[in-house]
UniProtKB/Swiss-Prot annotation:
Lineage, top ranks: Eukaryota, Viridiplantae, Streptophyta, Embryophyta, Tracheophyta
Any one Gene Ontology cellular component term annotated for this protein: membrane
Membrane-spanning parts: 8-28, 57-77, 113-133
Species this protein is from: Arabidopsis thaliana
Domain of life assignment: Eukaryota
Name of the featured protein: Protein cornichon homolog 5
Length: 135
């Protein structure tokens, strides 16, 4: 039963994480089609960056504490990438450069969504496996 609860909590972490990244991607798409101005886009994205980074760090720590080593190793590249962005101070969207870097910012978030989706599929598998094992 404990393993099932671990996977449910992990799934909730990942679902929240993918919602945050999809929200950022939607904001960038709105900028691309001129539905919103760059100042609003950058303030919306910048508001979500630190919660995304913190949630990814908590998820990696949660995997380590619960002993899910494969998932911890799988989430490390995403965590290290976020740490590298933060250390280089490239984690926030710049209002003046947002039009020029819009495609790159979208591409980064699409890769993040792919990585999170892979983690969700693996977590769902183990969630179902744990649920059926408890019967």
């Amino acid at each position: 039963m404990g393993d099932l609860l671990d996977w449910i909590i992990s799934f909730l972490f990942l679902a929240t994480l993918i919602i945050i990244v999809i929200y950022q991607l939607t904001c960038l798409a709105d900028l691309e089609f001129d539905r919103i101005n760059p100042y609003d886009v950058s303030s919306r994205i910048n508001r979500m960056v630190l919660p995304e980074f913190g949630l990814q760090g908590l998820l990696c720590l949660y995997y380590i504490l619960t002993g899910h080593w494969f998932m911890a190793v799988l989430s490390l590249p995403h965590l290290f990438y976020n740490i590298r962005l933060y250390m280089k101070r490239e984690h926030l969207a710049d209002v003046t450069e947002l039009y020029n870097t819009n495609k790159w910012e979208q591409k980064k978030r699409v890769y993040k969504i792919g990585h999170i989706a892979l983690s969700i599929f693996i977590t769902t598998y183990w969630l179902i496996h744990s649920a059926l094992g408890d019967i």
